[in-house]
């Protein structure tokens, strides 16, 4: 919905219906360049999927605002300690397990806006209370993210 382009990148509004079960995915090769910025969100949502999610050929994530692969996986382990994670130089596997813990989680962002936004969205699915160590980092790319998230989720 509302498709457009900015800086040669496609943009659109996405509406998510959480009534259906998420399924694990494999993403690699020529699909990665077009999804590189979305991989942190795909990784966090993989915690709620049925089956394994595999991301490969995404080595460039090691050289963004943070080492996004390592930071994403360490925060996933905090969010759900039961999740099985395999970390590779160019990606990861996430094999989710049921998480019955409702304990609050502090998410370390290292100033990375995509990590902060991804875990805020994941917290809506799990209804887990999370603390983002640096919410202001989101202003880099999406200054009204928290305002819109609150509005959309009501």
Spans of model-derived segments:
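Short, structured segments at the rim of ligand-binding sites
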Residues: 1-154
